[in-house]
A protein has these predicted regions:
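Extracytoplasmic thiol/disulfide redox context detector
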Residues: 1-78, 137, 144-162, 185-191
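Cysteine-centric redox/oxidoreductase cores and disulfide-bonded domains
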Residues: 2-5, 76-163, 167-191
Length: 191
């Protein structure tokens, strides 16, 4: 595989299969038959992850048949005290098939996540159209705490050190990328 110009891993031995990067229950969108599997490791409190979410939304609109996006949590607890709780809340939203709505609302309300009040997660659940009783039963009891940790450990094993980190068909690219950079990588992979 050709090396990308935007700081990717350069040797083919460092390619990681999608099977190792993602699990069947990870939030995903895009066709299963897509030529490109894009695995994202992200943190809901990371400003670069927030910036990237809007760019990736545009990318998926431009390449709806070519990219399957898979989301993995990588809460950077050392600097984002509510990132892990946000990831758990996202998993509870995914349980109701509303992950992407909740994902978008979390990023829209990112500054409120710095608050010491976990009620923001319940407000966002309501705003995203989740069943509040189901969400409370899930989030209030930490149902997905271990799953979030599994995502994090999968990221560590794959060499993720910060967010966002992307894997394009197994090739790692770190950091917030411009739409133009994303498109260059996608075009290279579609050749």
């Amino acid at each position: 595989m050709k090396s990308f110009s935007s700081n990717p891993t350069s040797s083919s031995s460092s390619l990681i299969t999608a099977a190792k990067l993602a699990t069947a229950d990870d939030p995903a969108k895009g066709p299963a038959t897509a030529k490109i599997t894009l695995v994202e490791f992200s943190d809901f409190q990371c400003p670069y992850s927030e910036e990237s979410a809007a760019v990736v939304k545009q990318l998926l609109q431009r390449y709806p048949d070519d990219i399957k996006l898979i989301y993995r949590d990588f809460p950077v607890d050392s600097i984002h005290s509510f990132a892990r709780k946000a990831a758990e809340a996202g998993a509870c939203a995914h349980e109701q098939d509303k992950f992407w709505e909740y994902h978008d609302k979390l990023f829209e309300n990112q500054e409120a996540l710095n608050n010491e009040d976990s009620q923001i997660f319940y407000k966002i659940a309501k705003d995203a159209g989740l069943d509040e009783k189901l969400f409370t039963a899930c989030f209030g009891f930490g149902k997905y705490k271990s799953e979030v940790e599994e995502d994090y450990q999968a990221g560590v094993s794959a060499g993720v050190r910060g967010t966002p980190t992307w894997f394009f068909n197994g090739q790692k690219v770190q950091g917030a990328l411009s739409l133009e950079t994303f498109e260059k990588i996608v075009q290279e992979l579609l050749k």
